[in-house]
Amino acid sequence: TGYPRNDVLFAKNNEKDITDIKKKLGISPEKKVIMYAPTWRVRNQFNMKIDIQELKKQIQDDYVLMLRIHPFAVKGLKEDLLDEFVINVSNYPSVEELYLASDIVITDYSSVMFDYAILNRPMLFFTYDLEDYRDTLRGFNFDFVAEAPGPLLKTSDEVIQSIVNIDKVAQEHDEALQKFRKKFCEYEKGTASEQIFQRVMQNQ
């Protein structure tokens, strides 16, 4: 049936609802939005590896950057990183609304990729510690390198340049994204809650 929590990604995927979400977040409707949502790495707190000042210099006229940090790692987020360009949404109650507000997601190995793929929007994978994560920390339960629905980027500069050239990057990785969606999002139709309700009622 898909996941009931993801039904909202269909129901609210429209200009009015997205504008309303941006207003709740304090983001201008005119701005495009990037969300950086890295996974928890077990042994460390959050450590910003993206050169925020360089990113800001390149894209601040057009974008806002939202940081969605894992609860176990958010203590490592330095308050002096935050300003009108960088906002902390780690405690925002609905990650689904954050997905809807985001034009691009930057992640790494997080399950964010499976839900955000439903929206068919670009994803960038900042995998600066790929070998360590795969071989030492947590590993993968699918062939991440072969099946990732976006580019695997090792450096901050690669991330920034991918954002600057996002239309080209998205086009180059669209085939991978569509394969990923077909494999992992097949049952996501926006009707999971209704399907489950109907099945429960049939069994009464």
Regions found by a protein language model. Give the residues of each.
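C-terminal alpha-helical cap of glycosyltransferases
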Residues: 188-204
